[in-house]
């Protein structure tokens, strides 16, 4: 059966978690995601054709103006994102295709050939309180491993000072345990993890940060633990690295974090080196509605302009480096708004089904 390109639409939330507060804005239906159709010249989706979309992933980042650093948020419930492809929908639905960004005529305030790259490590293994949504990763004890190393692959670092931020939790009764974080010879530590025998706290949380020059093609971080007694325990929540990186297209997909300078009356010009093989560069500041940037080529350097009204994010990529999706099967049409008024909804697991009823 021939599939009409114009009748293809993609839906999904990009994998992001819905807000915890019930009075925060949230979509009433699955959002429509803009896609790019490659090979749609004959109007039919053939074997050699493809559609591309920006899959932002389940974890998210936001810029903190107060700390002048990026902050990440791990999805509390899922490590996978799900999308729904409609192949027999109405034709040419408004907002279903990626459009060109508006040509920027504002004066250029910043010429950018570097950005603040970012990576984080966080795993969810231990729930200290056996309750809630706060989980921790690597565990320290007085008998087990007391040193954990983390390597972050960030090529083309320019040597400027970057940041390593981490958060830990610890439990030591009747003594004091120390935690240390080291990067490029600089150490941050906390020496006040100590609980009294009568304390109602299960553990104490602390944050560690170092500001240190970073160069080369990666950042190595070491977390260590000095237990105060045989019963002392500790856990790593996350380790996050941010370092100034040259804009060099070093892989099939390269993400660019825009200028931190805000100006409604000016633009920034970005310069991406070694990028002659790049097929497209999208503005993904709004992950559900990417925009296709106007590109200029100067040898192996690709340039484009963007407004500085917000902290923008971009992705440069080659078609051949796009990741494939994993098909999950077909889904019958559902009337999600036809359930009528519900007074109470209880979500549970089979083990607790009888109690929930």
Name these PLM-found stretches.
Residues 1:
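Mature N-terminal segment immediately following signal peptide/propeptide cleavage
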Residues 4-354:
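Structured catalytic cores of large enzymes
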């Amino acid at each position: 059966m021939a599939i009409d390109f114009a009748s293809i639409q993609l839906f999904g939330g990009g994998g992001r978690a819905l807000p915890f507060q019930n009075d925060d804005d949230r979509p009433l239906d699955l959002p429509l995601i803009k896609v790019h159709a490659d090979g749609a010249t004959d109007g039919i989706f053939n074997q050699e054709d493809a559609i591309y979309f920006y899959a932002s992933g389940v974890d998210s980042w936001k810029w903190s103006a107060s700390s002048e650093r990026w902050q990440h948020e791990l999805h509390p419930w899922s490590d996978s994102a799900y999308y729904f492809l409609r192949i027999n929908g109405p034709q040419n639905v408004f907002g279903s295709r990626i459009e060109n960004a508006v040509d920027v005529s504002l004066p250029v305030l910043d010429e950018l050939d570097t950005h603040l790259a970012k990576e984080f490590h966080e795993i969810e293994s231990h729930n200290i309180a056996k309750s809630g949504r706060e989980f921790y990763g690597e565990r320290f004890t007085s008998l087990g491993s007391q040193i954990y190393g983390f390597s972050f692959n960030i090529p083309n670092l320019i040597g400027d000072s970057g940041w390593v931020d981490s958060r830990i939790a610890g439990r030591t009764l009747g003594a004091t345990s120390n935690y240390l974080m080291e990067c490029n010879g600089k150490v941050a530590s906390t020496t006040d993890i100590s609980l009294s025998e009568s304390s109602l706290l299960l553990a104490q949380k602390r944050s560690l940060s170092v500001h240190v020059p970073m160069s080369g093609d990666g950042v190595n971080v070491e977390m260590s633990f000095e237990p105060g007694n045989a019963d002392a325990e500790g856990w790593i929540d996350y380790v996050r690295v941010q370092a100034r990186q040259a804009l060099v297209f070093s892989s099939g997909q390269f993400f660019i974090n825009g200028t931190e300078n805000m100006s409604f009356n000016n633009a920034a010009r970005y310069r991406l080196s070694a990028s002659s093989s790049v097929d497209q560069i999208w503005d993904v500041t709004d992950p559900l509605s990417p925009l296709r940037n106007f590109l200029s080529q100067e040898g192996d350097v690709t340039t484009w302009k963007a407004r500085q009204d917000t902290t923008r994010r971009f992705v440069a990529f080659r078609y051949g480096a796009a990741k494939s999706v994993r098909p999950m099967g077909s889904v019958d049409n559902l009337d999600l708004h036809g359930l009528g008024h519900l007074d109470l909804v209880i979500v549970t697991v089979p083990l607790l089904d009888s109690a929930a009823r």
